[in-house]
Amino acid sequence: AKQYCQVNVVASSEDKSFTYAPAQADWKLSKDAAYVHYTANETIGGVEFHWVPQTGDVPLVCDMSSNILSKPVDVSKYGLIYAGAQKNIGPAGLTIAILRDDLIGQVLPKTPVMLDYKTHAENESMYNTPPTYGIYIAGLVFQWIKQNGGLAAMEKRNREKAALLYAFLDQSNFFVSPVAKADRSLMNVPFT
């Protein structure tokens, strides 16, 4: 983002090697921000936001690549959700974008046509040849999720699997999970 605008880092957990999600009370939001971006689940560090940041009238933009479809999400709280399919939806090369209507077309003048969501919205997501195999696989995944109880069932399943792993790590005299318990990912369980 620094190539296109002034960036304000509103919060960081660098002080503890990125092992927790900074509390909302510690965030220093800019009143004139164009948007606030965060990553819902940090894959390598295994830190997950189990809450949605409150940004008032400032659009909230979220990278959900590693935890989309892992639990129900109220998309109305976001200006934009984007996710690469390669973690939970299908093969690499497919990206899901859920954009609030009032944000369509708000781009810098030099934005390439393929990076302007208005282009895709006006062409029903088929401005160019879509990745048909990826879409087919994603459709199979969506059907499987529905047949297995939907997103609420996926969340239950993920909580149960993560609880088993974390219980083992917490009682281990050898392995350690460095992530703050309240912010542990349900999708990625790092340990040393």
What are these regions (language model features)?
Residues 1, 12-68:
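Active-site phosphate-binding strand-loop segment of PLP-dependent enzymes
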Residues 2-6:
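Membrane helical hairpin/interfacial module
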Residues 19-22, 46-51, 70-76, 92-95, ...:
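A short secondary-structure junction signal
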Residues 61, 75-86:
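Conserved active-site segment immediately N-terminal to the catalytic lysine
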Residues 85-166:
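Active-site C-terminal subdomain of aminotransferase-like
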Residues 145, 164-179:
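PLP-dependent aminotransferase class I/II
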Residues 176-192:
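Conserved PLP-binding catalytic core of the aspartate aminotransferase-like
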